[in-house]
Swiss-Prot record:
Its EC number is 2.7.7.6. The gene is rpoZ. This is DNA-directed RNA polymerase subunit omega. One of its GO terms (biological process) is DNA-templated transcription. One of its GO terms (molecular function) is DNA-directed RNA polymerase activity. The keyword Transcription applies. GO terms for cellular component: DNA-directed RNA polymerase complex. It comes from Corynebacterium glutamicum (strain ATCC 13032 / DSM 20300 / JCM 1318 / BCRC 11384 / CCUG 27702 / LMG 3730 / NBRC 12168 / NCIMB 10025 / NRRL B-2784 / 534).
Amino acid sequence: MSVTNVSNETNATKAVFDPPVGITAPPIDELLDKVTSKYALVIFAAKRARQINSFYHQADEGVFEFIGPLVTPQPGEKPLSIALREINAGLLDHEEG
């Protein structure tokens, strides 16, 4: 009885995926450097995302109560992702209280 060693070293092709977006871009570690806690980041980003969302809704009506995105939005990008990119870029100041 003979045993043959077969090597599994074949040229495996690696799957190519789009990089994840949203909370992973910008990285959470970079965002946490901008605020005092992860809870402050959540509140800060949520408030700004609501402002951006309201801006889009009011722009259709011709009312401009809120300021629109301070970064160039990507096609189909959600308000929360825009807000996180603004925070990471240092374009916003916030007060905790």
